[in-house]
Curated annotation (Swiss-Prot):
Sequence ranges of the CXXCXGXG motif repeats: 156-163, 173-180, 195-202, 209-216
Disulfide bridge positions per record: none
Localization per Swiss-Prot or TrEMBL: Cytoplasm
Residue sites binding Zn(2+) 2 per the record: C173, C176, C195, C198
Domain notes: The J domain is necessary and sufficient to stimulate DnaK ATPase activity. Zinc center 1 plays an important role in the autonomous, DnaK-independent chaperone activity of DnaJ. Zinc center 2 is essential for interaction with DnaK and for DnaJ activity.
Provenance organism: Ruegeria sp. (strain TM1040) (Silicibacter sp.)
Cofactor dependence: Zn(2+)
Record's protein name: Chaperone protein DnaJ
Length: 385
């Protein structure tokens, strides 16, 4: 039976790059793996075919020969780049073809790395940590230095992070020679498993540290001084490199990320770098106009001139009285929104004065009222017609 085209076998085009060829083989290898095809009697042959195709196409010289001569390149001793394979046969060494994707492939099946992973697992980077920090709006405005206590894992001082009693260096695992994985031949397939002796670490500790039980780190609360810049807002993230969890067995530490939450303020509402403040004013002040004092976020006072006849909702701006920009570039503004307050709990004299005021008011005294009821009258007249 004639052989299928190698590119077709891997599901890639003839112009595929080396990376695309590798991805194609990895996909096929996962599809045809025996753990997933126990009921498919053809899976082994198809897997062998994919391995043979990848063995050729991953090698630039052998790929060039195949592109020029096809399968004939490896018949009758052709295919000069065969390098030690009898007759230049492309499928002679399963392990060599598979080794460069073994880590990724079996990591999916067994939850770990491949045969070279053990060396990396000896020293593992510590996890990144998150710390939520709640600030007042005043603190966010001014910035501050704040001391926080972070529960984390720190390097064990008893063993200097090695996990071994007295700080002794771990020894290489004799079973896997430090690789963290062992290989077993199962018929046609070579399967990698986590080393049972060292549990995939590639190392052994004869006398584990009694303080950290061989982990090289211990749980502890750390006190850190953090610089919070002026202008932070809810969602701002501050990264402290190397202040996260300590690494395993001498590995580098992770990072600490501080997430800022700014509490709501009783007077000010923030919108970007601008602040809004709703200020109640008396009916008389709104009608007659005049100056009022308003609070500012820095603890000071701002002076605002209210025009005569101001209505609720009118806004006035105090420039430069908002929040500082986090990365420089000036300061926001503060917007004053007037809320005209209708008087309550009136004395008899006050009621008398208001009645007199209403009686002597002219049509143009309350233009909005006049305009509204004029529209209402037109509406009713239209309904009658």
């Amino acid at each position: 039976m004639s052989k299928r085209d190698y590119y077709e076998v891997l599901g890639v085009s003839k112009g595929a790059s080396a990376d695309e060829i590798k991805k194609g083989f990895r996909k096929k290898a996962k599809e045809l793996h025996p753990d997933r095809n126990a009921d498919n009697p053809d899976a082994e042959a198809q897997f062998k075919e994919a391995n043979e195709a990848y063995d050729v196409l991953k090698d630039p010289e052998r790929k060039a020969a195949y592109d020029r001569y096809g399968h004939a390149a490896f018949e009758n001793g052709m295919g000069g780049g065969g390098g030690g394979r009898a007759g230049g046969h492309p499928g002679g060494d399963f392990s060599s073809a598979f080794s460069d994707v073994f880590d990724d492939l079996f990591g999916d099946f067994m939850g770990g790395g491949g045969g070279r992973a053990g060396a990396r697992q000896r020293a593992t980077r510590g996890a990144d940590l998150r710390y939520n920090l709640r600030l007042s709006l005043e603190e966010a405005f001014a910035g501050l230095h704040k001391t926080i206590n972070v529960p984390t894992s720190v390097s064990c001082t008893s063993c200097e992070g090695t996990g071994a009693e007295g700080g002794a260096e771990p020894t290489t695992c004799p079973t896997c020679s430090g690789m963290g994985k062992v290989r077993a031949q199962q018929g046609f397939f070579t399967v990698e498993r986590t080393c049972p002796t060292c549990s995939g670490l590639g190392q052994m500790i004869k006398n584990p540290c009694k303080t950290c039980n061989g982990h090289g780190r211990v749980e502890k609360d750390r006190s850190l001084s953090v610089n919070i810049p002026a202008g932070v807002e809810t969602g701002t993230r501050i990264r402290l490199a190397g202040e996260g969890e300590a690494g395993l067995r001498g590995g580098p530490p992770g990072d600490l990320y501080i997430f800022i939450e700014v509490a709501r303020h009783e007077l000010f509402e923030r919108e970007g770098n601008n602040l809004h403040c709703r200020v109640p004013v008396s009916m008389a002040k709104a009608a007659l106009g005049g100056a009022i004092e308003v609070p500012t976020i820095d603890g000071g006072r701002g002076r605002v001139q209210i025009p005569e006849g101001s209505q609720s909702g009118r806004q006035m701006r105090l420039r430069g009285k908002g929040m500082p920009a986090l990365r420089g570039g000036g300061t926001g503004d503060m917007f004053i929104e007037l809320a005209v307050e209708t008087p309550v709990n009136l004395t008899p004299r006050q009621k008398e004065i208001l009645k007199e005021f209403d009686e002597i008011s002219e049509e143009n005294t309350n233009p909005e009222t006049r305009s509204f009821f004029s529209s209402v009258k037109s509406f009713w007249d239209g309904m009658k017609g």
